[in-house]
Design a protein with these regions (language model features):
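A structural signal for well-ordered alpha-helices, especially hydrophobic packing surfaces
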Residues: 4, 8, 15-18, 22, ...
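Long, contiguous binding/interaction regions
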Residues: 25, 35, 62-75, 91-98, ...
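Helix-loop segments that flank and shape redox-cofactor active sites
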Residues: 14-39, 60, 103-114
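Short, charged low-complexity intrinsically disordered segments located at boundaries
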Residues: 43-51, 73-74, 79-83, 127-134
């Protein structure tokens, strides 16, 4: 079973990668991708804080984000580079965004308020990842 602590770690990683993609976006559809990536990382960092606080209130510990990618238990490939094409960005966002959505969907054992926050995050993330990024270039 996933925990809020694990979910918050993956949300942070997604936000961090979205910020890197945002900084180095280039090429066609630059402005729309640049703005959507900013929306994505802002949503991720807002919910990272919410989920981390909820995890702590449930007796879970939250790792320092600087250590997250170094953890052996984390299944994540950080985004590296300094120039990203439209297709690369869309692929990264969809792959990693849907991974985080699936984690939230499979999170059990928390009371209704926590689940409602996870559902709200997943809905917002799904809107950005699968709808807005899915429409780029169409």
């Amino acid at each position: 079973m996933n925990t809020l602590s694990e979910l918050s770690s993956y949300v942070y990683l997604l936000g961090n990668d979205a910020r890197i993609l945002h900084l180095y976006t280039e090429g066609e559809n630059f402005m729309s991708i640049h703005e959507l990536l900013q929306d994505l990382y802002e949503v991720c960092f807002e919910y990272y804080d919410t989920f981390a606080e909820m995890a702590i209130s449930h007796g879970e510990s939250i790792p320092n984000p600087s250590d997250i990618v170094l953890s052996e238990g984390i299944d994540w490939n950080p985004t590296f580079g300094d120039a990203f094409s439209t297709n690369f960005i869309i692929g990264e966002v969809k792959e990693k965004g849907n991974k985080v959505i699936a984690m939230g969907d499979n999170l059990d054992g928390y009371e209704g308020f926590v689940k409602s926050e996870i559902d709200a995050f997943n809905a917002e993330l799904d809107s950005i990842v699968n709808y807005k990024f899915g429409r780029i270039g169409k």
